[in-house]
Amino acid sequence: MAELKNDRYLRALLKQPVDRTPVWMMRQAGRYLPEYKATRAEAGDFMSLCKNQDLACEVTLQPLRRYDLDAAILFSDILTVPDAMGLGLYFETGEGPRFQRPTDTIDSIKKLCIPDPEDELGYVMRAVSTIRRELKGEVPLIGFSGSPWTLATYMVEGGSSKTFEKIKKMAYEEPATLHLLLDKLADSVILYLNAQVANGAQSLMIFDSWGGALSHHAYREFSLRYMQKIVDGLTRHADGRQVPVTLFTKGGGLWLESMAETGCDALGLDWTVDIGDARRRVGHKVALQGNMDPSVLYASPERIHQEVDQILSSYGEGTGHVFNLGHGIHQHVDPEHAGSFINSVHELSAQYHK
């Protein structure tokens, strides 16, 4: 593997000195870019794009050609793991992801097999190794997975949900059944993420997109408990370097202290959290990633600049901050505005690292 030329992102996650605040964007390879749309059209559909290692590599690299980013993130989907368990993932226009065979009974959950990441998920591993090779050491590669709770919401509900009625019913009516599913998913995610590291991922992120839908105590029981299990089981060193781990619970501002106790290296923040307050609460233990509202990118470059300045000022001096959005970039954002955001981080952040 080529030697890493820009390790700013990895250093910030480990709270080591940096010359400026590193920046990347969740969903930076995505529908806001015309070149992504062209590649997706070439693939035919979303999952065909994910499963073609050369096209997945191409869309991963596209934002890096446009912008001076400090990290690349694997182009894939969080639902690859349940798909590999045989649930029959498909996408309906306007409806999002759906499963042909939901796992909403104890019998269906008992039948689930933990997928071999080099077999059923081999296409992801081939994409990871291809991307790592093609990056040529320019920036580190982030691997990722959904959290067990978030994956389970799709598996039990049969797809996206606004109310999570089925899985919450299971949580309170048949908690042992849900724990069986979450435990299988945690084991699957550990294997999946460790295989990503073995194939070239240099940092890992766990997306708990729907943890914020849980009550205070239910979050610890059904989400955090299983992210803790994953953190405990991950490969934390590869290629002579530490492999940092970031946990991100959307709507998780209540639980930052508990999340920081897992032993992860960093926490992702959504835009509802004041990053300065988060630093005072947990900055002695973990780095922080975030957290500009993605909708700010609809604003003028001047307003984007102001928002970046405000977040940098709130975090304050020193390392331990990776600038990002508070969630994925919206598909209708002007790519030029994304460029303004990244340039503003570069321009304004150096003064905080003297």
Curated annotation (Swiss-Prot):
Pathway it works in: Porphyrin-containing compound metabolism; protoporphyrin-IX biosynthesis; coproporphyrinogen-III from 5-aminolevulinate: step 4/4
Cell location: Cytoplasm
Cellular component annotations (GO), alphabetically ordered: cytosol
Main subcellular location of this protein, as a coarse class: cytoplasm
Catalytic reactions of this protein: uroporphyrinogen III + 4 H(+) = coproporphyrinogen III + 4 CO2
Sample GO molecular function, one term: uroporphyrinogen decarboxylase activity
Keyword Magnesium: no
EC number(s) reported in the record: 4.1.1.37
Site (Transition state stabilizer) location in chain: D77
SUPFAM superfamilies: UROD/MetE-like (SSF51726)
Top-tier EC class: lyase
Stored Pfam families: URO-D (PF01208)
Domain of life: Bacteria
Binding site for substrate: R27, Q28, A29, G30, R31, D77, Y154, S209, H327
GO biological process: one example: protoporphyrinogen IX biosynthetic process from glutamate
Keywords tagged on the record: Cytoplasm, Decarboxylase, Lyase, Porphyrin biosynthesis
Record-linked InterPro entries: UROD/MetE-like_sf, Uroporphyrinogen_deCO2ase_HemE, Uroporphyrinogen_deCOase
Stated family: Belongs to the uroporphyrinogen decarboxylase family.
Function in brief: Catalyzes the decarboxylation of four acetate groups of uroporphyrinogen-III to yield coproporphyrinogen-III.
Subunit structure: Homodimer.
Protein name: Uroporphyrinogen decarboxylase
Organism annotation: Shewanella sediminis (strain HAW-EB3)
Taxonomic path: Bacteria, Pseudomonadati, Pseudomonadota, Gammaproteobacteria, Alteromonadales
Gene: hemE
